[in-house]
Amino acid sequence: MQFTTPLQSAILIKRYKRFLADVRRPDGQIITLHCANTGAMTGCATPGDTVWYSSSDNPKRKYPSSWELTHTQAGDWICINTLRANTLVYEAIAQQRIGEVSGYTKIRSEVRYGAENSRIDLLLQAEDRPDCYIEVKSVTLLQSACGYFPDAVTERGQKHLRELQHQVQSGVRAVLFFAVLHSGITHVRAARHIDPRYAQLLAQASDLGVEVLCYGAQINPAGIRLTQPLPVTV
C-alpha cells in the first residue's frame, strides 16, 4: 500500500481526547491531527516521537490532517492509523501473497453476518471451496519484543471471536488475522494480563478450528506492505 500523497513529519506534543494529537511542524507551527486509533496506544504516543501525517483537501473536515505513522525515539516504526490494516490485508490476499488463504477468486469487504449483527472485515469466496471469513486486528502493543492484543479490554473483539466460532461450526472457514504494525514486534500473544476473557475466547476459538494468522509489515513514509509470517501464541 502506497500513500497517495507524500506524508509530512512533525514532533508529537501530546495525544488527547482519544481522537486528537498536537504536533509541532519543522517550521515551529503547532497543528492538531485526527487520530483514527481509539485504543490505549501504549508506547505509541510518546511526546518527542516523530509522527508522519497525511493531509486532505476536503473542506468539510474539521481536522484535515491524519496521524499515519510514528517513528519512535527507539527507532521503531508504527502504523497508528488502524484503518489501514484492512487495506493491507486485502491487498496482500488479492496479490496472492498470503499462502494460507490463496486461491479464492472473490473478496468482499464489510459483509453483514452472524447472530450478533456483525460485519466481517473480509469474506473470501470461490466455487471450489467453502467461504472464508476473515477478521483483521492491528497489533501495536510492544512489551519485551512481544506484541500483545488487545491493548485494552474489548467487548467488541470478544463478540468477533464468538462470531468466528459460530462460522466454523456452520461448516465454513474462519480466520483471525493479526496485522503486526510495529517494527519492533517479533511474535504475538493474547494479552491475558489486559483482557483475560478475550484470551480465553481466543484459545477456545482456536481449539474449535478458527485459524489464527499473524504477519509483520514493512513500514516507512512511502507506504506499508505485509511481508513475513510471525509466530503467534494463543
From Swiss-Prot:
What Pfam family does this protein match (any one)? SfsA
Citing just one GO molecular function, the answer is: DNA binding
User: Domain of life here?
Assistant: Bacteria
Indicate the family of this protein. Answer: Belongs to the SfsA family.
**Name recorded for this polypeptide:** Sugar fermentation stimulation protein homolog
